[in-house]
Amino acid sequence: MKPIELSFEFFPPKTADGVEKLRATRAQLLPLKPKFGAGGSTQQGTLDTVLDMQKDGLEAAPHLSCIGSSRDSLRAILDQYRSHGIRHIVALRGDLPSGMGEVGELRYASELVSFIRAEHGDWFHIEVAGYPEYHPQSRSPKADLENFARKVKAGANSAITQYFFNADAYFRFVDDARKLGVDVPIVPGIMPITNFSQLMRFSEMCGAEVPRWVARRLESFGDDRESIRAFGADVVTSLCQRLIDAGVPGLHFYTLNAAIATRTICERLAV
């Protein structure tokens, strides 16, 4: 059986201590031989993090968001990435600035994908985002799927999904996408569970559903962090095993710049 491909999400640190913590995290995860590491928030912070990843010998896939950006600014960023030998981009719409309407010259990720292809041809491997439980701002499940298909047909090579805890939601999303002609790999996004309140806050923001039984168990542990981590590792390992058994093309972990939970899950899976 072909080994499952792993990739890890990091976010650019805001402090010197954060930079050192992220380096330590990567050092702990590199033995798992990830296919690439992704990350982004601020443009300069993203570049600094990406260049640091490259020093570790890790292929980097910076996030690139189009909301609030002009074509000229996007062109400059892409040229900069290419000049550093970066071949992998995660193309996103991005979040709308608070209190503002649609801003920037490109409004949708599909337009960003088309722009990257027009500017750089096949130089970049382009990832886009998928939402098994649908984007929280989508008009309907049908509209969300159609938007996903547009991103892929604009020239994306593959997709990474938002995290989820219901494998059936992912399987249904993939089936529905295939019916719309999407034929690229759709890699499931995985969120290790280490903090109950943080998990619920993130899930509320991004529209990911935490099963009631999982939430109730986590809540029952109160401040017992060890029990939360142990139970969380059990839940996420079981989810990953089901996905692997179904033949997913990879697993993409949202590490939150921490290594232990992700490494524990991968070691249990023997991947």
For the regions a language model picked out, list residue spans one by one.
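Structural preference for beta-strand elements that scaffold enzyme active sites
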Residues: 3-7, 36, 59-63, 88-90, ...
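Active-site mouth loops of central-metabolism enzymes
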Residues: 4-23, 60-72, 125-143, 220-234
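Conserved, mostly hydrophobic/aromatic
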Residues: 9, 32, 81, 151, ...
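Active-site beta-loop-alpha junctions enriched in small/polar residues
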Residues: 10-13, 37-39, 63-69, 94-96, ...
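Active-site pocket-lining/capping segments in soluble small-molecule metabolic enzymes
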Residues: 17, 104-131, 180-233, 238, ...
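Glycine-rich, positively charged N-terminal anion/phosphate-binding segment
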Residues: 19-26, 40-58
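Glycine-rich, proline-tolerant flexible connector loops at the mouths of alpha/beta enzymes
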Residues: 33-49, 94-104, 157-172, 256-258
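Glycine-rich anion/phosphate-binding loops
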Residues: 66-83, 103-108
